[in-house]
From Swiss-Prot:
Motif (Cholesterol binding): 492-493
Source taxonomy: Bacteria, Bacillati, Bacillota, Bacilli, Bacillales
Disulfide bond as UniProt keyword: no
Signal sequence interval, chain numbering: 1-32
Main subcellular localisation: secreted
Protein known as: Alveolysin
PROSITE patterns: THIOL_CYTOLYSINS
Keyword match Signal: yes
């Protein structure tokens, strides 16, 4: 009996041991199993949006406009022609202005919504994990990266200053910065058009350069803007493997949703920021020449042509303005001049990065947290391209010195435009048409600046029964000129003529 009791006790101990082993094994398997996916990763992955549509901007839509207009001014006739154009751009390099510097630092979390598209991004403020930022200054090698605790505008800016200081103290004397210059130019037609063409907020251009958009639309002025961006260095934020890598463990997707994250406003991160200086140059003229754009482009490439050449008249009626953002901007905060060589000096001055000529955040790029794809703003705008043509008055000088009786016929069309821009043509005739003129006869016929389709005809009386009148001049569509000289001479059988203008 005692042996049996001991045997039962042994079996109980064995069973207990097996149960303990199973519990331990189950616990070990449970602890080794993969953890549940972070709800931030799941929430952002589940956002449903089209990245090409969420940042699409529908700019000006023009349904009606007056295609042509005629203006009488100071003895001249000015024709303003308007043509509807469309412009589509998808910039990924977004310009930075002072008002948004604290919303566009490397690693900043933004919302992809209309505010972002309008260059006034909204931030998502939440507790963050440390963030690695790096700089591409030459020579730093392993010293080019720093980990930022609690990344925000202040801490990231401080870290960037530290990286720049390290380069300045250790490597600036042995390493030079490569020249990285971005250049763009465009004629100005409307606020949305120039904003899209140069990828900059039109309000900034208007506030710094003073563009008179109304004068441009009315054809009173022609304006070109050139943008020079000189990049000294770029600071990049480390891209996360998962969105949750950016946020503290205490942050949930529900918190991000409360702070604006949604299908209509998915989250972004500023992946890199370019630092340097930006120079905006405004070229403005009151010239009505159709060669203004060509003249301005040539001047931008070669300022020495201002004093001579075929476009001298355009330059004499032009003024130039330059505004510098970044670097030692106080040296050339705003320069207004009629000498483009002064503008060229502004562009060349302070082109080297140094402690006295610091860099300024000039542009940034953001990525969608869902897949790290680049956030591009898709602009689509319509605008009116305005072309002005100025016509001056002219005159026809008739001179008859031939040995015969002559008759002249002169007429022309005068054109204008109605309120809808439709051309109105009125036929005008010289009151001396078909009168007999003997030598020597000379007269001047004034022509208004809106004259066209000029017709000049002259005939002489031969005295021959079978050919009483012989044509001497028979010209249609003579172009309007300040002086149109018509001369006839010779004899009845051998009349001569010439027209010069």
């Amino acid at each position: 009996m005692k042996k049996k009791s001991n045997h039962l006790k042994g079996r109980k101990v064995l069973v207990s041991l097996l149960v303990s082993l199973q519990v331990f094994a189950f616990a070990s398997i449970s602890s080794a199993a993969p953890t549940e996916p972070n709800d931030i990763d799941m929430g952002i992955a589940g956002l449903n949006y089209n990245r090409n549509e969420v940042l699409a901007i529908q700019g000006d839509q023009i349904s009606s406009f007056v295609p042509k207009e005629g203006i009488q001014s100071n003895g001249k006739f000015i024709v303003v022609e308007r043509d509807k154009k469309s412009l589509t751009t998808s910039p990924v390099d977004i310009s930075i202005v002072d008002s948004i510097t604290n919303r566009t630092y490397p690693g900043a979390i933004q919302l992809a919504n209309k505010d972002f598209a309008d260059n006034q991004p909204s931030l998502v403020m939440a507790a963050r994990k440390p963030l690695d930022i790096s700089i591409d200054l030459p020579g730093l090698k392993n010293e080019n990266t720093i980990s930022v605790q609690n990344p925000n505008y202040g801490t990231v800016s401080s870290a960037i200053d530290q990286l720049v200081s390290t380069w300045g103290e250790k490597y600036s004397s042995t390493h030079t910065l490569p020249a990285r210059l971005q250049y763009a130019e465009s004629m100005v037609y409307s606020q949305n058009q120039i904003s899209s063409a140069l990828n900059v907020n039109a309000k900034v251009l208007n506030g710094t350069l003073g563009i008179d958009f109304n004068a441009v639309a009315n054809g009173e002025k022609k304006v070109m803007v050139a943008a020079y961006k000189q990049i000294f260095y770029t600071v990049s934020a480390g891209l996360p493997n998962n969105p949750s890598d950016l946020f503290d463990d205490s942050v949930t997707f529900a918190e991000l949703a409360r702070k604006g994250v949604s299908n209509e406003a998915p989250p972004l991160m500023v992946s890199n920021v370019a630092y340097g200086r930006t120079i905006y140059v405004k070229l403005e003229t009151t010239s009505k020449s159709n060669d203004v754009q060509t003249a301005f482009k040539l001047l931008l490439n070669n300022p020495s042509i201002q004093a001579s050449g075929q476009y001298k008249d355009i330059y004499e009626n032009s003024s130039f303005t330059a505004v510098v953002l970044g670097g030692d901007a106080q040296t050339h905060n705003q320069v207004v001049t009629k000498d483009f060589n002064v503008i060229q000096s502004v562009i060349k001055d302070n082109a080297q990065f140094s402690s006295k000529n610091p860099a300024y955040p000039i542009s940034y790029t953001s990525v969608f947290l869902k897949d790290n794809s680049i956030a591009a703003v898709h602009n689509n705008t319509e605008y009116i391209e305005t072309k002005t043509t100025e016509y001056s008055k002219g005159k026809i000088k008739l001179d008859h010195s031939g040995a015969y009786v002559a008759q002249f016929e002169v007429y022309w069309d005068e054109f204008s435009y109605d309120a809808d821009g439709q051309e109105i043509v009125t036929r005008k005739s010289w009151d001396g048409n078909w009168r007999d003129r003997s030598a020597h006869f000379s007269t001047e016929i004034p022509l208004p600046p809106n004259a066209k389709n000029i017709r000049i005809f002259a005939r002489e009386c031969t005295g021959l029964a079978w050919e009483w009148w012989r044509t001497v001049v028979d010209e249609y569509n003579v172009p309007l000129a300040s002086d149109i000289n018509v001369s006839i001479w010779g004899t009845t059988l051998y009349p001569k003529s010439s027209i010069t203008h």
